[in-house]
């Protein structure tokens, strides 16, 4: 057990859009501390989004994240030798974090093109409520719905 609650670190906004959510996406895309590379990927993806949708990439991205955010998830809870998957509501910071993680994972799973293209396609897909990240959210909600009987084990 922690002596005190871990402090929530404030992420500084990104240099181009001045947006904290974009900065968080850059941090999720980043590997081995290579932030400049991650920024090139994200800003490149935003340029592709601008070309393909003819809309503001920031608005498309924000809506995509909103579409992917899960409302419920299941957490294991041990009760008398049995482990139940208990559905619980997801807190707002975790919703955002999961949405960004799922978008980046889905983009990485796409094969055969540069990362900026894959990321742009995944964000556009999420904006249109399709794609792997949306499927992941729906699977999570389906799991929560299937285990609704154990909701009274919440803590």
UniProtKB/Swiss-Prot annotation:
Keywords: Ribonucleoprotein, Ribosomal protein, RNA-binding, rRNA-binding, tRNA-binding
Family matches, as Pfam families: Ribosomal_S7 (PF00177)
Gene Ontology MF terms in the entry: rRNA binding; structural constituent of ribosome; tRNA binding
Purpose: One of the primary rRNA binding proteins, it binds directly to 16S rRNA where it nucleates assembly of the head domain of the 30S subunit. Is located at the subunit interface close to the decoding center, probably blocks exit of the E-site tRNA.
Family indicated by similarity: Belongs to the universal ribosomal protein uS7 family.
NCBIfam families: rpsG_bact
Name of the protein: Small ribosomal subunit protein uS7
Subunit description: Part of the 30S ribosomal subunit. Contacts proteins S9 and S11.
CC per GO annotation: small ribosomal subunit
InterPro entries: Ribosomal_uS7, Ribosomal_uS7_bac/org-type, Ribosomal_uS7_CS, Ribosomal_uS7_dom, Ribosomal_uS7_dom_sf
Organism: Thermotoga petrophila (strain ATCC BAA-488 / DSM 13995 / JCM 10881 / RKU-1)
Protein's GO biological process: translation
Transmembrane region(s): none
């Amino acid at each position: 057990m922690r002596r005190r609650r871990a402090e929530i670190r404030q992420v500084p906004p990104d240099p181009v859009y001045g947006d904290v959510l974009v900065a968080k996406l850059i941090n999720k895309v980043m590997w081995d501390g290579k932030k400049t590379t991650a920024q090139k990927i994200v800003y490149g993806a935003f340029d592709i989004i601008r070309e393909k949708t003819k809309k503001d990439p920031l608005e498309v991205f924000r809506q995509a994240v909103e579409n992917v955010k899960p409302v419920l998830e299941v957490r294991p809870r041990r009760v008398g030798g049995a482990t139940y998957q208990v559905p619980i509501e997801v807190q707002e910071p975790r919703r955002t974090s999961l949405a960004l993680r799922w978008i980046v994972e889905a983009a990485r799973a796409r094969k055969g093109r540069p990362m900026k293209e894959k990321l742009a396609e995944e964000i556009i897909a999420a904006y249109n409520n399709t794609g792997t990240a949306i499927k992941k959210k729906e699977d999570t909600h389906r799991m929560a719905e299937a285990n609704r009987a154990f909701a009274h084990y919440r803590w």
